[in-house]
Amino acid sequence: MLMKNRIVKFVVLVCCLCSMPGIVRAQLSVHQFDQLMKKIDDVLWYEKVGDIAHVDKVILCGPPRWKESNPTSMSAGNELKFRAYIFIPKSVKENKKYPLIVFPHSGVHADMDTYYAHIIRELIAQEYIVVAADYRGSTGYGAGTYNNIDYGGLENEDVYISRNYMVDNFDIVDGSRVGIMGWSHGGMITLMNLFNYPGQYKCGFAGVPVSDVIMRMGYASDSYRKIFSAKNHIGQTAKDNIAEYKRRSPVWPAETLKDPLLIYTNTSDDDVNVVEVESMIRALKAEGKKFEYKIFERAPGAHSFDRLDTYESSKIRLDIYKFMGRYLKPNKPFGSVKELRKAAYKF
């Protein structure tokens, strides 16, 4: 019934959009359009993974804004609400426990969407339970959530809260087998969660992770830098407040790592420069930390090299799952690329 209701809403949304005069469509704000696209993509989750997973979306509370624009307003100091997706394999038994994957999405001002459907299918097939938070700053929920961005800050705690929600509220989740994995900005959040909450995760994978925000400001575009210096965010440039940008960079708290970690990067990455990730690797080595990493040489796909639908990308992901599986012990680990691809693409 829930699936049918979502399909009906989807059809209504598309019909309404198509029937609007061009001038009206043009007047839709960016946030209104993002909200519309989010609702459509939410329906697609049921189409893409609903055959093997129970799909749900919950509302959680994270800490208050790190900086209030109006300290005397009625909402000042209130916890911030955010959404989180939950994917549970349909094969689970209520009297058993299963490992949990915490999956922070990639992108600045982005959201968890069906770009990752094939990877969610791969995780579900191994009988992982997955939680994926649309943490503060995510798109698809209006200007309020968007403007609450806290890059490298309390967004990390939002993701950690989603972890705790699953452990505390689902008896089928094994709290001793919780892993975290993500790419790009999600890789950065993976690192920060491992560094900020040592011992709370059994292991982690960080793919092409943003690692040094100060360095990043040196090669990023002006539009990217303005996201950070905007009044609703840091409100200052890195030149004006180096300490604040340092606080948001995983490269600095590397000494706190206690849990198994795997890092992947690519020399042809056109988003997170390999030099930035190399700085993270060097910092961990300098602290004498035991971890694993691999620097791929001009792998096809650049920033997305190990998230593609190609056979080669599937091979790389199989190695990632083998690493995670060492510590999380899923019930149905993949034995081959063929098994992985059948899980992701059905054939």
Question: What is each model feature region?
Answer:
Residues 1-5, 9-61, 342-347:
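N-terminal targeting or regulatory segments adjacent to alpha/beta-hydrolase or S9 domains
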Residues 21, 134-135:
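Membrane-interface helix-loop junctions at the exits of transmembrane helices
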Residues 36-96:
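N-terminal cap/lid segment of alpha/beta-hydrolase-fold proteins
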Residues 60-70, 135-347:
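Active-site-proximal cap/loop segments of hydrolase catalytic domains
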Residues 80, 98-100, 129:
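Hydrophobic core residues within well-ordered beta-strands of beta-rich domains
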Residues 87, 103-104, 181, 264:
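Short hydrophobic segments within beta-strands
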Residues 95-107:
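Short beta-strand element of the alpha/beta-hydrolase
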Residues 113-133:
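Short amphipathic alpha-helix adjacent to the substrate-entry channel of hydrolases
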